UniProtKB/Swiss-Prot annotation:
This is Protein-lysine N-methyltransferase EFM1. It is found in: Cytoplasm. InterPro entries: Efm1/Rkm1, Set10/Efm1_SET, SET_dom, SET_dom_sf, SETD3_SETD6_MTase. Residues 23-281 form the SET domain. It is an enzyme of class 2 (transferase). Its EC number is 2.1.1.-. S-adenosyl-L-methionine binds at Y280. Coiled coil: none annotated. GO terms for cellular component: cytoplasm; nucleus. Signal peptide: none annotated. Keywords: Cytoplasm, Methyltransferase, S-adenosyl-L-methionine, Transferase. It comes from Saccharomyces cerevisiae (strain ATCC 204508 / S288c).
Length: 585
């Protein structure tokens, strides 16, 4: 941690070079948050009142970086990388580096040892294995190495000797290969930042993390020639970047006519000793952890990410624009990857429900039906529950050679705990929604369990057929589907039974349109031979009345697909009248 003297030197340096810090603000070092800014007395700043003004000459931008790396002037796409490399050279290079002596008081307050997970021990990082943060870290580091190597090649810079073995990991693999996170951890942990050279990967990673936690978008400078579409190009804003980040805090940054970048808090009133915060944008806890190294369980912008891999042909046929909804990630022609953010405030995004409703829709259905939505909820619940189980089963793991730091253990536990909380909210929302949809459509449904209880003659026949004394026996003996098929054909053959009119109608629609192939008959032959003609002879009062041919069962099987939803809680088949469901997306 930096010292109060280093902090005071930085503040004095800024003020000596034209910066203004309102006298009502003081900076000090705290045990929990490091450098923090506090308001000394109660006051109400005006919306356009600059509490901090910093001359443009104190900012670290791509302009200074190009003074050091002039050959990068034509590499517009690498400007942010060049600025980060310049910071590495300022921090870890020799005193001869352009402007190093000028920026020294500021560089001294940039912490050498950072709290971000990229600098955790291997054992600490391995406790994130299987999480979204783990995958994000792996992908970020692989992307960062690619960017770093490309930058060095463009600028004709030699890599540090300490990276020789590390670089071999990427020279042996193709560009598309992904180097495991464990190998990154081993290299990063094996490098001491205080002894590292400016052209080492760990120095570049340090600079990347400094930018992630402190940089401001260059577009706010309002300079001519600034690519306003490139929001990734950042710069460092001394003094203001000492303010801690907090979501929901209203702030403004604006360049004035004197080329001073002004910080204006939009908080209406401060009490004495209130902390003065900056806001880099309302961000999730995942970004708080990766960018700043902290976690806030009260963060209303937090989410748990649900990632789905689906066949591309399946997704392309859906009437949902996942690009527009922001859920599309990649598509390699075979597999489409979609991601959904689940939040406590919105545990079930409408587009996610729509996706599973469409995935559960039959080809014969033009739009999702009540049945397909209920079935889609079951499938989605299964996916979310599987993810939830992963978080529930988590236990801290460590090897005998490494000790986990208490504050890191706390962060890891909070990560699992809060993801578990969000996923629990999603499963509860799905359960409540499913019950509501079923309740609203109960008058258009027919429970097979109720049928079994009321149709004594049919139920008694199943005692002879399956040895099923009660409904539960049909489940335990794994003959529920066979019983369904037998009952549907019985219903169709019983002309005097007015029950299940919508079932009879669907059966007729299927019977009139179905084309039965030889393969269909062969598939049903074992089932048919298992029961007929035996049932016709043993229980003729049911199984000899009407048409009990194999075709009837093939038609009944398709009718089941269109009408039956199996309630997961008790494996109860429920017939649902075909009825469109408005997804409202």
């Amino acid at each position: 941690m930096i010292t109060q003297t280093e902090l005071d030197n930085c503040l004095q340096w800024a003020q000596n070079n034209g910066a203004f810090i309102d006298p009502k603000i003081s900076f000090r070092i705290t045990e929990d948050a490091g450098v923090s800014a506090f308001v000394n007395e109660k006051f109400s700043p005006k919306p356009d009142q600059a509490l901090i003004r910093v001359p443009e000459t104190l900012l670290i931008t791509s302009q200074q970086a190009l003074s050091e790396f002039s050959q990068a002037a034509n590499e517009r796409s690498l400007l942010n990388s060049v600025t980060q490399l310049y910071l590495s050279k300022l921090k870890f290079g020799t005193d001869a580096v352009h402007l190093k002596s000028f920026y020294k008081p500021y560089l001294d307050v940039l912490p050498l040892h950072l709290p971000q997970p990229y600098f955790w021990s291997t054992d600490e990082v391995m406790n994130l294995h299987g999480t979204d943060v783990y995958l994000t870290m792996r992908d970020t580091l692989n992307k960062l190495v690619k960017e770093w190597r490309m930058l060095f090649q463009a600028l004709s810079i030699e890599h540090s000797s300490q990276d020789k073995q590390f670089l071999s990991l990427f020279q042996e693999n193709k560009d598309s290969a992904v180097v495991p996170l464990e190998q990154f951890c081993a290299h990063i942990n094996g490098c001491k930042l205080e002894d590292s050279e400016w052209n080492s990967f760990v120095a570049y990673l340090w600079s990347y993390c400094i930018f992630n936690s402190r940089a401001f978008p260059r577009v706010i400078l309002g300079r001519a020639g600034t690519d306003r579409t490139n929001l990734n190009e950042g710069f460092l804003y001394p003094i203001v970047d000492l303010l801690n980040h907090k979501n929901d805090v209203p702030v403004r940054w604006e360049m004035n006519e004197q080329n001073e970048l002004c910080f204006m808090s939009q908080t209406t009133t401060f009490s004495a000793q209130d902390e003065l915060f900056n806001n880099y944008g309302n961000i999730s806890n995942e970004k708080c952890l990766l960018n700043y190294g902290f976690w806030d369980s009260s963060n209303k912008f937090d989410f748990s990410r649900l990632t789905l891999k689906l066949p591309s042909t399946l997704v392309s046929g859906l009437p949902v624009d996942f690009n527009k909804s922001g859920n599309f990630v990649t598509d390699d022609g075979e597999t489409t990857i979609l991601q959904f953010s689940l939040k406590i405030s919105e545990p079930l995004p409408p587009v996610l429900l729509a996706l599973f409703a469409y995935l559960s829709k039959l080809k014969s259905e033009e739009t999702p039906t009540v049945r397909s939505v209920l079935e889609g909820i079951d499938q989605l619940t299964s996916v979310v529950s599987q993810r939830l189980l992963f978080y529930k089963n988590f236990k801290i793991k460590t090897s005998s050679t490494q000790k986990l730091r208490p504050h890191v253990i706390k962060l890891i536990k909070l990560y699992y705990q809060d993801n578990k909380k969000i996923l629990n909210a999603t499963t509860e929302k799905l359960s409540v929604l499913q019950k509501k949809i079923y309740s609203n459509n109960k008058e258009f449904s027919l429970s097979f369990k109720t049928i079994f209880k009321n149709d004594k003659i049919f139920a008694n026949s199943l005692l002879l057929v399956f040895g099923a004394i009660n409904y539960e026996d049909l489940i335990t003996k794994d003959c529920l589907n066979d019983a369904l098929l037998l009952w549907i054909v019985k219903l169709i053959n019983d002309k005097s039974n007015n029950q299940g009119g919508f079932i009879k109608q669907t059966f007729k629609e299927v019977s009139d349109s179905i084309v039965i192939e030889k393969e269909d008959v062969m598939e049903f032959l074992p089932f048919y031979k298992k029961y007929f003609p035996n049932l016709s002879e043993r229980i003729p009062e049911i199984y000899s009345v009407g048409d009990w041919g194999i075709r009837q069962f093939i038609v009944a099987d398709t009718a089941i697909d269109r009408l039956v939803w199996i309630r997961k809680s008790n494996k109860e088949p429920i017939f649902l009248m075909k009825k469109a469901y408005d997804l409202q997306i």
